[in-house]
């Protein structure tokens, strides 16, 4: 494939709380050895949209996507049903309120197929196009199966130890 660009929408309830995302992995649906993708890049972006539009730019919802992973080339080896991590992942602070837009793109590959598991949904949660310079793509009512690694922000209210001790 000459190039590919895809956006997935992850709903805020699937993540659960604010924190720092330290990794993203996909679940392979086939065995793949030496699957190479050139000029590979992953970006993450907050968005208030609950469903994707057919425009990559509109889906940013006025926010700036942040590059979190890139390699040229990247080579993946994956076992069917196994997870493969994005390379050289840079932390991204997720606000816990918005939905999360996950965008991946590459320019050319070596022809080795690496398929990933998807999940069906009733709303448009995936947008793709085979040309990077096209802003309008093709919508699907599916999304990729991700494993997002996140270090949650403090979720327990700060209280005085005196108040806690007084309760005993």
Predicted features by range, described:
Residues 38-123:
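Aromatic- and Gly/Pro-enriched, solvent-exposed loop/edge beta-strand patches characteristic
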Residues 1-51, 99, 109, 116-153:
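Beta-sheet-rich sandwich/jelly-roll-like modules and their strand-loop junctions
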Residues 150-168:
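Residue-level detector of functionally pivotal "anchor" positions at catalytic/ligand-binding pockets or at interdomain
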């Amino acid at each position: 494939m000459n190039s590919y660009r895809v956006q997935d929408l992850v709903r805020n309830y699937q993540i659960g709380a604010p924190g720092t995302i330290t990794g993203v992995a996909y679940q392979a649906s086939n065995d793949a050895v030496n699957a190479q993708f050139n000029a590979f890049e992953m970006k993450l972006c907050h968005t208030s949209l609950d469903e994707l539009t057919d425009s990559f730019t509109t889906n940013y919802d006025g926010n700036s996507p942040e590059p979190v992973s890139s390699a040229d080339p990247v080579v993946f080896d994956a076992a069917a049903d196994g997870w493969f991590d994005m390379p050289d992942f840079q932390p991204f602070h997720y606000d816990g309120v918005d939905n999360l837009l996950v965008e991946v793109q590459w320019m050319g590959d070596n022809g080795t197929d690496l398929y990933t598991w998807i999940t069906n949904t009733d709303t448009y949660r995936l947008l793709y196009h085979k040309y990077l310079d096209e802003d309008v793509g093709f919508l699907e009512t599916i999304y990729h199966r991700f494993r997002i690694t996140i270090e949650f922000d403090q979720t327990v209210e700060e209280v005085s130890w005196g108040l806690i001790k007084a309760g005993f």
